[in-house]
């Protein structure tokens, strides 16, 4: 299985207070990184082992999905431990291929929860990563933004986007803000992932 990602920026930031230190940043849409556990508070029905997809209730819910590829995924994808681990390992390999040991900061999109984020973090930990953060938001599919970092992460918070009634949508995803401390400098970082036209 091959998972594509885009590095929208792998930038080096230079700050006067950091002397000559640099910070490398990667942003990575991991495209539905789910664990294998059914969460009744999230729409994760596509990302379950096939043995949990056999009920008529599950099939009925899947058949309500408008987009054909998503509907088939909900019905037939066997999201088991082996499948999930293969995806995690592909993401891990892509991250550490950046530079010698991965970027200093990774901004991730489409992560289900802290459980699956923690699994990715422990794969990366031997490469100098020390912290990770994810805050649950109100996205109806249950996917969140997250950070994994070689620096300590402070003050995580979500900024919800408010629209006028003319442009209001059923849901939107908040912007995830956090702060890194590098030497004596506090640097704010932001992670945004906006809904597709299907929502």
Model segments located where?
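N-terminal, active-site-proximal structural segment of metallo-dependent hydrolase catalytic domains
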Residues: 19-123, 137
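Residues in flexible loops and secondary-structure boundaries
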Residues: 9, 16-17, 41, 116-119, ...
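Classical Sec-dependent N-terminal signal peptides that target proteins to the secretory pathway
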Residues: 2-20
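Structured beta-strand-rich core segments of catalytic domains in phosphoester-bond hydrolases
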Residues: 105-107, 111-195
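A short, polar/proline- and glycine-enriched secondary-structure boundary/capping micro-motif
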Residues: 37, 168-169, 199
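Basic side chains
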Residues: 4-6, 87, 173
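Sequence-level detector for tyrosine residue identity
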Residues: 3, 19, 41, 66, ...
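Feature marks short, surface-exposed loop/turn motifs that line or immediately flank catalytic pockets
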Residues: 32-34, 195-198
């Amino acid at each position: 299985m091959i998972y594509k990602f885009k590095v929208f920026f792998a930038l080096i930031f230079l700050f006067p207070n950091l002397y000559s230190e640099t910070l490398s940043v990667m942003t990575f849409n991991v495209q539905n990184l789910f664990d294998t556990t059914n969460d009744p508070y999230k729409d994760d029905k596509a990302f379950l082992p096939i043995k949990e997809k056999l009920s008529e209730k599950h099939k009925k819910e899947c058949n309500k999905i408008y987009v054909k590829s998503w509907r088939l995924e909900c019905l037939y994808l066997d999201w088991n431990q082996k499948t999930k681990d293969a995806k995690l390992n592909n993401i891990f390999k892509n991250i550490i291929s950046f530079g010698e040991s991965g970027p200093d900061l990774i901004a991730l999109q489409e992560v289900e929860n802290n459980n699956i984020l923690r699994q990715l973090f422990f794969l990366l930990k031997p490469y100098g990563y020390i912290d990770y953060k994810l805050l649950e938001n109100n996205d109806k599919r249950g996917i969140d933004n997250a950070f994994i970092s070689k620096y300590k992460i402070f003050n995580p918070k979500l900024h919800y986007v408010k629209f006028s009634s003319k442009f209001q949508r059923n849901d939107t995803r908040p912007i995830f803000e956090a702060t890194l401390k590098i030497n004596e400098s506090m640097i704010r970082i932001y992670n945004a992932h906006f809904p597709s036209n299907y929502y």
